[in-house]
Amino acid sequence: MSGVEEISTLDEFRERRSDFEISEDERRRSKIGNLKKKAINASTKFTHSLKKRGKRKIDYRVPAVSIEDVRDEKEESVVLEFRRKLLERDLLPPRHDEYHTLLRFLKARDLNIEKTTQLWEEMLRWRKEYGTDTILEDFDFEELEEVLQYYPQGYHGVDKEGRPVYIERLGKAHPSKLMRITTIDRYLKYHVQEFERALQEKFPACSIAAKRRICSTTTILDVQGLGIKNFTPTAANLVAAMSKIDNSYYPETLHRMYIVNAGTGFKKMLWPAAQKFLDAKTIAKIHVLEPKSLFKLHEVIDSSQLPEFLGGSCSCFGDGGGCLRSNKGPWNDPEIMKLIYHGESSLFRQSTRKLTDPHYSSSYISIHPSKAIQAETSAAESISCSDVPSSPTGRLCSASSHVNSAYEEARASDVNGYYSCDDKFAIPDKATNRKGQERQSQYQMRELNATTIGLKCETSSPGAPIIRWLHDLRVMIDKIKCENLAKRLLSLMLKLAAVFRYTPLELLRSQTTVSPSSLTEDDSRCSLISPPPREPTMKDRILPCLERIQKLEKSYEDIRNKPVAIPVEKERMLMDSLDRIKSVEFDLDKTKRLLHATVMKQMEITEMLQNIRDSQLHRRRRLFC
């Protein structure tokens, strides 16, 4: 029995030992599994950090805004033709490449492309000289509060169609006191600044609120109390300069104008004088209303959007200055302004209808990323390729950036398409879809060829081992299995360390470049190290100066050879001006004679009245005597 007991105790010992070994194996496996999970998490974090570094994702999860956009087919074709011509002449900056901006200028010249091009060139020249593009940031109108005391004005609400309402109380304007506070030049800069603010803030905000395209304003001029005292030479110069800016540089931004509280004197004397500063199109948009006709404003503007002095029901405080200081409107809504300016991108869904066919409608999406996101994305992309200038990945990135820039230039060269905020996402047919797939495959093949060319070039360069190891690392990481991830990653890192150890420092510092022309001519060719720049000689320095002197001499000869005589058109203008002066002198002489005759007649009447009074007094004296 003792032998049996020994066998049983031996079996128990083996079972305990096997249980202990099994538990140890499980612990090891669990530890290995935890290590694998940690390695996978670390690798995913590392790759995600690299992806985030290379590009930033833009979150478009904002509420889509549907904006109706009604277009005329004829106007649209003229706009496309005008845009193509501007692109050919390099006269279309990106900030002005917008359908409704081009249409406004075309309407100002009756859809005449030649005349509109001249107006457009003048506008671009003026914006560059005046600094209009940065006037919102550069110009500070410090005297605004004092100016508004002597020239009450401001935006207040919207009309029934969603356009912003601009109000001026001309009857309470004092030009002489205004010029003591500011100057004409500073006030004109403030005028331009308000126009730019309307284009960049008020019109987009009203478009989002009204869900239709808003590109113009409704203006109300209150002329109650306006008289000759308000029409000084300074006021005339200011009005002329403002009308020049409005008509030439911001055309077709006025939808309609109402001159309210106009008396008989204004209609007969002041209104005819004011028409001399306006063009025919602007005059056709102006409606003159008497004090009894203020109710006509309610046909186009709701009473809640009108101040009390114009027959409305609004009596907002407006920072102590009444309705004109309140700046009431959709542009004060933080949610709307967040869509326009803030960090979130805005997604506008535009629906287009043609006037010729009311049943036709097409919708398209226009994405407007914010300026902050654009700057952040561009900065991240620039960092991703330029962090390590001596690394081969940086070289490959530079080669691919050359291809991307070439692709962008090829896409931008298509002037027949309209690539602005109004690009249509229409449903293509089979033929166009096939063409699009072919183009996409061509672009993909170009990028693939560029990558292979970059690899070929790098293999012939001195730092080829580094590129090969990094390429192998990328391929192996894609194909590797989870259970061997930590082991293989460690071995690859050791191999990389050995390569860096035995590779000379000069080979690491050498850089290669891939020229874009080699991508299109021959895939087997690649440009290696660029030759050092040649030092400029004395001849190279003198040659540009000689060319400039020759140009100056040529221009001087052209100016000298010009005829001294006055051109025929200017001579006609001078003759017409002389004729007008003569006619005015004749009218003045005639008026002078009439005034003289009137004075003489008045003196005769006065003398006759005096004689009659004397005779009556003489008769009374006789009666009393």
Curated annotation (Swiss-Prot):
CDD domains: SEC14. Keywords: Cell membrane, Golgi apparatus, Membrane, Protein transport, Transport. GO terms for cellular component: Golgi membrane; plasma membrane. The keyword Phosphoprotein does not apply. It comes from the Eukaryota. It is found in: Golgi apparatus membrane; Cell membrane. The keyword Isomerase does not apply. Residues 143-318 form the CRAL-TRIO domain. It is a peripheral membrane protein. SMART domains: CRAL_TRIO_N (SM01100), SEC14 (SM00516). One of its GO terms (biological process) is protein transport. Pfam families: CRAL_TRIO. InterPro entries: CRAL-TRIO_dom, CRAL-TRIO_dom_sf, CRAL/TRIO_N_dom, CRAL/TRIO_N_dom_sf, PI/PC_transfer. Required for transport of secretory proteins from the Golgi complex. Catalyzes the transfer of phosphatidylinositol and phosphatidylcholine between membranes in vitro. Belongs to the SFH family. This is Phosphatidylinositol/phosphatidylcholine transfer protein SFH13. It comes from Arabidopsis thaliana (Mouse-ear cress). The gene is SFH13.
